[in-house]
A protein has these predicted regions:
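Ligand-binding beta-strand-loop-alpha-helix segment within the catalytic cores
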Residues: 116-118
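N-terminal non-catalytic cap/leader segment that marks the start of a structured domain
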Residues: 1-86, 179, 187, 196-198
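A generic local secondary-structure boundary/capping motif
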Residues: 4, 54-56, 77-79, 103-112, ...
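Residue-level "contact hotspot" at macromolecular interaction interfaces
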Residues: 58, 111, 224-226
Length: 226
């Protein structure tokens, strides 16, 4: 199931994506009365063509807990080693934007980088979740761009300022509830003003240091996830 959050002239709604998203005119969004946290959508009876709506960030969480250096190759790019335990940091909700919204480069930075990530959406408040039980608290997954002011990150050593500027966390386009997080390609392709494009990031979640279940167990031992 694909869960989207979208805007129409009548307001903001959640909906279930049905059909081929590569054909926006025929792909539809069946409106639901609220985000189906339990995986059981309640339909309102209204439907919209994907081409008729504006997709928004699929969720607006209370906090974004991110994991750094979880890919061996990326850790090498930063000139550091991977860790026996997840390296976590928090991005504020004010970083979140939806698909197609411009990322604003802060005046303090001359180098802003993309970091394509698999984002885990938690379906309930939870604490001290065992890794073997982690699937129970996952609603689904979406795509995140952990935008980073790389020059600031390298100059300061700590990551909070470099990763917390407004617009520094694009999310979407929707939540995928039936997805295997252990084998997903993370591909970032940049399109230039002249129409040309190039692949800037090509990774697979099979290469992570810490799995989704291990990450949930670790973070929920520190703070409540909700």
């Amino acid at each position: 199931m694909r869960i989207a959050r979208f805007a129409t002239p009548d307001g903001v709604s959640f909906g279930i994506v049905e059909g081929d998203p590569d054909s926006p005119a025929t792909c539809t969004l069946r409106q639901v009365d609220e985000l189906p946290w339990d995986g059981q959508p309640v339909f309102t009876g209204k439907s919209f063509a994907l081409s008729e709506v504006r997709l928004l960030a699929p969720i607006f969480p209370t906090k974004i807990v991110a994991v750094g250096k979880n890919y061996i190759d990326h850790a090498k790019e930063l000139g550091s080693q991977t860790s026996d335990e997840p390296v976590i940091f928090i991005k504020p909700p004010t970083t979140i934007i939806g698909p197609g919204v411009p990322i604003r480069r802060p005046a303090a930075s001359q180098r802003v980088d993309h970091e394509g990530e698999l984002a885990i959406i938690i379906n309930q408040p939870c604490r001290n979740v065992d890794a073997m039980d982690a699937r129970r608290v996952i609603l689904g997954y979406t795509i995140a761009n952990d935008v980073t002011a790389r020059d600031i990150q390298r100059a300061e050593g700590q990551w909070t300022r470099a990763k917390s500027y407004d617009t520094f966390c694009p999310l979407g386009p929707w939540i995928e509830t039936q997805l295997d997080p252990s084998d997903q390609d993370i591909l970032v392709e940049v399109t230039h003003s002249d129409g040309s494009s190039e692949v800037r990031q090509d990774e697979n979640t099979a290469a992570v240091v810490h799995t989704v279940s291990e990450i949930i167990e670790f973070i929920s031992s520190v703070m409540t996830l909700l």
